[in-house]
C-alpha cells in the first residue's frame, strides 16, 4: 500500500555531522556515518549541497525580517544567475545544513559565511513552514546556536538564507510487516511506537536489539532522520498518521547528543505534538521509534 504526501521540496537527509560519543552504549549518532556532508562552492554568492543538490545562498545579507518579508526577499532575489530562490522548508531543507557536531555555531562556516556573529536574532533563521495550530500567525525557524527547530510569531524579525531546487514528493509504503519504507530516503521505519517511554540509553539498546520484519539491523534514528518523517502541516501528532498510525503526540528520542563540553549529557529529541526539535537530559523518559537503512 502506498501513502503519498506532496511537499514542495523534499530532499534526502544527510549525516548530522556528530562525530563525538558521550556514553559507552553503542548506537549513538557517531557510531553510524550516513551520507557525509559535502558542499561545492560555486562562486562568492552560492554553494551547492552535493548530497541534496540544493543550491544555497552562501552569505545572508545580515538583515532581520518578519516571516512575510523573508519570503518576499527570497522570491525577489537574483543571485548566481538565478531568480527562482525561495524560503527553505524546515526539515526537508534548512535542517539539512545544520551541523550538529559543532559547538554553538552549528553550520560549516567554510561554505556558509556570516556564520560567526553572536547574538539572539543572528542564530535564528526563518523557514517557510507554518505552524498548524488553529491560532496560526506562527511559523517555524531553526536556531543555529543549538540546532533546535521551533515556532514563533510571524511578526518577529529573524535572519534569512534562501534556497533553490526542484519540487519532489514524499511517499511512504506500508510493507505489511509492521514497517514503513520512505521511498525518497530509502529508510525503513518501525511503524508503531516501541513499548513505553524510556531513558536515552535504554532507547539505544532497544533499537540495537530489535528484530522486526526478519531484520536485526535496527537503530535509534539521528535527529535529521527523525525530522524526515515530521509533517508540519499536521499537529498532535505532526506526522502522516496513515503511514504511522497511533503515533503519540509527545517527544521521541533521537540518537544525536548535543555537542557540549559539559560533563552532563543532553540529547536532541523531537516533539511530535508540534513538530519541534528540542533537547533534554539523557535521563528523561521519551518514546522510541526505530529505523534501519540509509547507510
Predicted regions span which residues?
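Glycine-aromatic-enriched surface loops/turns that form tight recognition elements
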Residues: 1-86, 90-219, 223-295
